[in-house]
Regions:
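C-terminal output helix
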Residues: 114-124
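Receiver (REC) domain active-site loop signature in two-component systems and cognate sites
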Residues: 58
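Active-site beta3 strand of CheY-like receiver
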Residues: 43-53
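Conserved acidic carboxylate
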Residues: 7
């Protein structure tokens, strides 16, 4: 399985990679624009991402906007199943959570700092990790 980490903070990228590296082939990008490019490339190479972990607050293109673009691509290309996308953010704000799920159609949401336990719990819910 393949995972894409979309995170602008170095330490967060390093921690998330350490949590996922035994479960997934992991790629890392630093903003939403690169996330959309990596997503497209994965499908063009017939090697799509099973999981995308995406920060919300990032430079250039934020996580919610990037997720909307990814979902639009999935619809245009009739890609099924859709990628599982877990949004990560330091903002524990109900409005941001709702926007992630309803505007971006996120699969899950984790408030930072992300722990191994919270990430694995989300992966279990999304059936990407067995108990």
């Amino acid at each position: 399985m393949r995972a894409l980490i979309v995170e602008d903070e170095f330490l967060s990228r390093k921690v998330l990679r350490s949590f996922l590296m035994t479960l997934f082939e992991v790629d890392i990008v630093v903003n939403g624009r690169e996330a959309v490019e990596a997503f497209k490339l994965g499908h063009e190479e017939n090697s799509p991402y099973d999981l995308i972990l995406m920060d919300i607050m990032m430079p250039e293109v934020d996580g919610i906007e990037a997720l909307k673009k990814i979902r639009e691509l999935e619809d245009q290309l009739t890609l099924r199943p859709r990628a599982k996308v877990i949004m990560t953010t330091a903002l524990d704000d109900p409005q941001t959570v709702l926007k992630s799920f309803y505007d971006g159609e996120a699969s899950g949401y984790i408030v930072k700092p992300v722990s191994r336990e919270s990430l694995y719990k989300e992966l279990e819910k999304l059936e990407l990790l067995k108990k």
